[in-house]
């Protein structure tokens, strides 16, 4: 068994509900030669700006999006990636994509970098930290408390509780200049604020009033955990947005508020001033 010594130590998650893919992405980059990107990548990939709320506050609604967007989004943040995935209704390519994903995982672990995978521990993202060709198993680390380590047979990758395959590996830096990363981050933030997602949930800026209604006229004691989860999830993500703009000199005084609300952000993204 080849297994990397990786933990969630040093990954900022003040609420305990940080989106598991963002948490896994930051941890993977932190445990790579490109660790300088570990905090920024949550924002520069666009995940820090994404919000959507279903009518019944279903926590699974946060996982309804195009998984194959991970590669171009992360590469927009300055890192090169490999991605292997499969959706429902693609059983005819299940084996092909699973073998591709396992190959990507092995190469990544051999480089000393964990892989990000869907359905690790619970139906959320987590890390693949190792592999064993003799037993044909993968070593895994869950992003959800109690952060259990486990093993997963090769044949079960992408075939567990929710049979979708999504494996992202980081392969290096792509040389993208920081000013271009900032400009493209602003563009992605605008798209997300405007609700540029293919799901039917309230999204972008519309997610705020949709969530607030569940604290007022739609208040229900039985939905207490759902409200806590969504607030914790998006609140933790917005920390990374704030940190990124702070580093780039746009979090002081009114500038960050303008960027957050979208008007100033649109100008910076599409006009340049």
Predicted segments — roles?
Residues 2-92, 110, 116-123, 131-273:
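Cys-His-centered catalytic/binding microenvironment captured across papain-like cysteine peptidases
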Residues 104, 114-115:
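Generic recognition of flexible, low-complexity loop/linker segments
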């Amino acid at each position: 068994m080849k297994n990397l010594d990786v933990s969630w130590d040093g990954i900022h998650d003040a609420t305990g509900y940080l989106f598991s893919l963002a948490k896994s992405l930051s941890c993977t980059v932190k445990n790579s030669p490109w660790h300088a990107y570990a905090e920024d990548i949550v924002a520069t990939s666009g995940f820090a700006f994404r919000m959507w709320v279903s009518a019944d506050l279903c926590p699974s609604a946060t996982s309804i999006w195009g998984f194959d967007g991970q590669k171009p989004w992360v590469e927009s943040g300055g890192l090169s990636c490999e991605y292997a995935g499969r959706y429902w209704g693609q059983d005819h390519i299940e084996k092909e994509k699973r073998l591709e994903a396992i190959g990507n995982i092995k190469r990544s672990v051999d480089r000393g970098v964990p892989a990000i995978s869907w359905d690790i521990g619970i139906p959320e993202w987590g890390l693949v930290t190792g592999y064993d060709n003799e037993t044909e198993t993968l070593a895994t680390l869950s992003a959800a408390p109690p952060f259990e380590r486990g093993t997963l047979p090769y044949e079960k990758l992408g075939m567990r509780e929710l049979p979708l395959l999504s494996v992202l590996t980081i392969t290096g830096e792509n040389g993208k200049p920081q000013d271009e990363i900032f400009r493209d981050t602003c563009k992605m933030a605008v798209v997300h604020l405007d609700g540029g997602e293919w799901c039917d949930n309230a999204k972008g800026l519309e997610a705020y009033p949709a969530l607030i209604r569940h604290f007022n006229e739609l208040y229900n004691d039985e939905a207490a955990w759902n409200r806590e989860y969504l607030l914790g999830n998006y609140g933790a993500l917005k920390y990374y947005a704030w940190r990124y703009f702070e580093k780039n000199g746009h979090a002081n005084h009114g500038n960050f508020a303008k960027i957050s609300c979208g008007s100033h952000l649109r100008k910076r993204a599409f006009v340049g001033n």
